[in-house]
Amino acid sequence: TDLEDAFAVSTVVGGEIVDQQTAKTVEELSANDWVAWSGTGALAATVGKALSGGADGSPASADYTDFLAAIEPYKFDVLIYDGTDTTVQDAMVAFVKRLAAEEGAYTQLVAAGLTNPDDRFVVNIMSGVVLSDGTTLTPQQVTWWAGGALAGAQYNESLTYAAYPNAVDVSPKLTNSGYIDALTAGQFVLFADGGVVKVEQDINSLVTYTTDITGPYHKNRVIRLLNTIANDIYQQFSDGYIGVVNNNEQGRMMFKSAIVGYLLDIQANNGIQNFEAEDVTVEPGEAIDAIVVNLAIQPVDSVEKIYVTITVN
């Protein structure tokens, strides 16, 4: 160190230095998120000492509030909460709703045991699973896989009938009417099929429809598509048009052409269908520097219901 007789004291977790201080005595060391120092006197050189007996502690509601404030500036597709605290659940639900309504940032919360969230941005996990080694995971623990699977799915993919890795059964088991009731209530449920656990239907918790928010919004594939389009168009506008393109007919036509080209790519990848250039309009806004974009799209969903008619002659 630069200080004579002083030592660099590093806290290493998982091979990474998470805290480093320079001190001569124990009293000069400050507690960090991992270690609370004790003792007195001068420090002595050591090549490292493994610590044990620590505890993770239990996060308080304020910790979750701080966490949400910390992640808000970032872009993310899925937020997972694997706890049962109803206060935290309510805060998480309110958070993703506000991001969509006020910030134009579209993400989904994945949690378990919520009480009728009824929102397209909330996925409510009902099922636990039994793994091949006999371990039983609660619905809260299933949020880990479900959240990762939802975040990893593309806008042209559905998780309906997707298999849960190494799972052989579900907990609790449901009857056929139980599955119907759960799906009707907007719950994300799993079922066992010949020793393989699968997603019954890739849906969110939305169950109350309006003129604007209709049945297709209940499907997570549709939500992924809409979120992708909204986020991509914003990014395209931000990267290449804000402060660069004139807000006149020519400038607006340039932006429309870019959007049309983008949506044609989405259509080629089976995200939307029956799209035509006339389905996009870019108009001047009320302010001199504003534009208004209107899109009309028809999402493509995956086949989930097959009706067979047999005629006997």
Show which residues each predicted segment covers:
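Surface-exposed assembly/interface segments
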Residues: 1-313
